Amino acid sequence: MKTFHLRKEDVKRDWYIIDAKGKNLGRLASLIANVLRGKHKPTFQPDVDCGDYVVVINADKFTVTGKKLTDKEYKFHTNAPGGLKVRNLQWMIEHKPTEALALAVERMLPKNKLQKRYMKRLKLYAGETHPHTAQNLKPLEEVSKLWKAI
């Protein structure tokens, strides 16, 4: 019996939708990262891009526990002298509503060549509307056993 190795041509990609309203940021990002990688599929292989598309609506209405709104910091540098910028989670939600969830998902993905491909399949929208109705979106709840933990 030969060992099965998944090829790009054999991958069938589905589209899933999830409403982030009231969901915990970390648990939601972890679930989305697993679906983007394809870990929910029985044919998962870490070196092959076999993940699915994920559409997230209400991406700015997630919840966090504790004092993370004021204490969690996002640091970036402008590459100018003295250009270190520090923003907290509350500022990110007010000024860049979907960026906080995108960063959480991106940081939960493996840091390799496939990370950019995974992130291109993540579609984040701050409101209820999205332009992906033609893709026959399935609710993400029916895929994951981890859904009860969110």
UniProtKB/Swiss-Prot annotation:
Q: Which molecular function terms from Gene Ontology are attached?
A: mRNA binding; structural constituent of ribosome
> Gene3D superfamilies from the entry?
Ribosomal protein L13
User: Subunit arrangement?
Assistant: Part of the 50S ribosomal subunit.
Please provide an example of a Pfam family that matches this protein in its UniProt record: Ribosomal_L13
Is the keyword Ligase in the record?
Answer: no
Q: What does this protein do?
A: This protein is one of the early assembly proteins of the 50S ribosomal subunit, although it is not seen to bind rRNA by itself. It is important during the early stages of 50S assembly.
Keyword tags: Ribonucleoprotein, Ribosomal protein
The Gene Ontology biological process annotation of the record reads:
negative regulation of translation; translation
Query: What is the top-level taxon of the source organism?
Result: Bacteria
Which family does the record assign?
Belongs to the universal ribosomal protein uL13 family.
Note the PANTHER family from the entry.
Answer: LARGE RIBOSOMAL SUBUNIT PROTEIN UL13M (PTHR11545:SF2), RIBOSOMAL PROTEIN L13 (PTHR11545)
User: An example Gene Ontology cellular component term from the record?
Assistant: cytosolic large ribosomal subunit
Sorted alphabetically, which InterPro entries does this protein's record hold?
A: Ribosomal_uL13, Ribosomal_uL13_bac-type, Ribosomal_uL13_sf
* Gene that specifies this protein: rplM
Protein name, per record = Large ribosomal subunit protein uL13
Write the signal peptide boundaries: none
